[in-house]
Amino acid sequence: MMKFAVPVFPGSNCDHDMVNALRDILHVTADLIPATATSLAGYDAVVLPGGFSYGDYLRSGAIARFAPIMPAVIAFANAGKPVIGICNGFQVLTEAGLLPGALQANRSAKFICQDSPLRIANHETIFTTAYGSTDQISLPIAHGEGNYYCDEATLAQLRANHQIIFEYVENPNGSTANIAGITNEAGNVLGMMPHPERAVEMILGSTDGLGIFQSVIASQEEVTHA
């Protein structure tokens, strides 16, 4: 059975939602890992959850990037293993240099909490294959600093390498090129502002978030059986 690690920083608040989605809905092993830990040995994937790590002082994710667990996360990613950063987790990944660009305050300068339609821009990743031919999904967003920014050279590289995975249909926050989620060039690290863990059962209003985790699980099963 696949094992997911969910690092918990002071101020994380979506960690239990993430573990619930993985354990109870997807029936895989998921453990909460304290930010003070220094090893991810034995795990197959890592998910950095949403929240307000270290109170989002300085910048969102800026202090979490220096947590004791982060060298292990960086090594995990550099080894080609799946890493997902959701909302604050995305911010941490950019601060850690695992993903390009940065997350700024929303253009409206207001916290946004709503469902947001997304276009799947690349179906051929370890995070999106389960969506098949589905072109559009809807996921909840909840952030004050979700406005993705990168310079023109970085945007050109993201497009050339097909690293833009999710795009807002109706850009809620001012993100460059409507970007809602990107991967690293190797394709094993995903950062996204929307919350797939909040869309995993119909009592929550949608199951559109399941495909991301189902894709990762399927990709690792292929590796195991290869």
From Swiss-Prot:
One of its GO terms (biological process) is 'de novo' IMP biosynthetic process. Residues 4-226 form the Glutamine amidotransferase type-1 domain. The keyword Nuclease does not apply. Keywords: ATP-binding, Cytoplasm, Glutamine amidotransferase, Hydrolase, Ligase, Nucleotide-binding, Purine biosynthesis. CDD domains: GATase1_FGAR_AT (cd01740). Its EC number is 6.3.5.3, 3.5.1.2. It comes from the Bacteria. InterPro entries: Class_I_gatase-like, PRibForGlyAmidine_synth_PurQ. PROSITE patterns: GATASE_TYPE_1 (PS51273). One of its GO terms (cellular component) is cytoplasm. Part of the phosphoribosylformylglycinamidine synthase complex involved in the purines biosynthetic pathway. Catalyzes the ATP-dependent conversion of formylglycinamide ribonucleotide (FGAR) and glutamine to yield formylglycinamidine ribonucleotide (FGAM) and glutamate. The FGAM synthase complex is composed of three subunits. PurQ produces an ammonia molecule by converting glutamine to glutamate. PurL transfers the ammonia molecule to FGAR to form FGAM in an ATP-dependent manner. This is Phosphoribosylformylglycinamidine synthase subunit PurQ. It comes from Lactiplantibacillus plantarum (strain ATCC BAA-793 / NCIMB 8826 / WCFS1) (Lactobacillus plantarum). The gene is purQ.
